[in-house]
Amino acid sequence: MISRVAEALALSDLLIPAFMPLSHQPRPWQGAAPRQRRGRGTEFWQFRPYTAGDDAARIAWRASARYRQPLTKEHEDAVPSSLTLWVDRRPTMGFTTTARTKQHQADVMALAWGWAMARQGDWLISLQGGPHQRYHDILAMEQDLDKQVLFSQGPLPPADKVLLCSDFLYPQETLAALFSLIRADDVQVCMLYDPAEVSFPYQGPIRFRDLAGGGDCLVEDAQALRTSYQARYAEHTRALEALALPRGWLVTRYSTEGPLTEMLG
């Protein structure tokens, strides 16, 4: 199997020219310029009227003569944009009936996005709730990704953009509590699923094992549960969207059966 780093490197090469936004809103994503704010930087930003107490050395004499009023120069501080990546690492992410687990696909997705941003040079990246920092090595990024803890233990650090990767198989009240801990406006919720979790292709007697340690469940006729199961799963997906969409977040769904290049479409 190709390593997740190799897959992420290949995918990140596609993300940059694709200019893919993290939100459905028309905000810059790949290659976005740093924000500007008034500061003590060396780059000229704008003129403004001179006021008492301003440094006389900053008076723009030529501009003041042209506009016939005293003007002073303002400079800018470049403020790097920040991206927080969170990948769920619960046991349910390891379930698979395909060549790739939800965990593997989520890791590749996060690494690709993070590395694409890190290569732009003006993005600070936070992995798994850690501090925002500059990354110069995707292997270091991968190591920090593996340190994941549930962000229910505390809010994620404030960020301009947030990418959440999970199967989101939580009770609705748990999802609501988790989402309340996110301090960002531009958020993408990436819901990964195994095709069997949607189609429920089982029939006859089946013993289901709870990957989270809740014990086994023996079902005598799995096929008889298919319709009710599919309805419950669809209801859960709608509940997730009902929590995310009113916040202005984007919800996308990816099957482990398909390539992650689907995110480019």
Give the role of each language-model region.
Residues 1-39, 44-54, 63, 68, ...:
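Exposed, interaction-prone extracellular/peripheral surfaces
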Residues 60:
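Short, surface-exposed charged micro-motifs
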